[in-house]
Amino acid sequence: IIHVSRNPKDNCLSIFENLFDYPEGWNSDQKELAEYYLIYKDLMEFWNNIFRDSILNVRYEDVILDTEKKIKELISFCDLNWEDSCLDFHKNNNPIKTVSFNQANKPIYKSSIKKYELYEKELEVLFSKLD
């Protein structure tokens, strides 16, 4: 199991920005989004206690800042062989059916790290619950 976590504020900002079409609407309500995030955080803590040796926890920011090292750790955890092409993921022409399709065909970029700082005033309700 590979669990990638991210700065809670950046993570929630990304969810908020992407307008996922969930009928419950939790992703577009600052208070509810914060509550869901905190539930997720507690749940991951629970799973980490149960499956400690089976979960590799990776911070998104670490992958961005030290890509090769972190991808090598992921590859090793999966008991796969390293190939230099692992760093060329953005050159893959296979279709991508996720909200990140537009990002996955580009090299890694740092502009999403601490992006939340641009919206601290507008998302004060959300961010105050995550502190």
Stretch-by-stretch model annotation:
Residues S5-P8:
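A short beta-strand-to-loop transition that corresponds to the Sensor-1 phosphate-sensing loop
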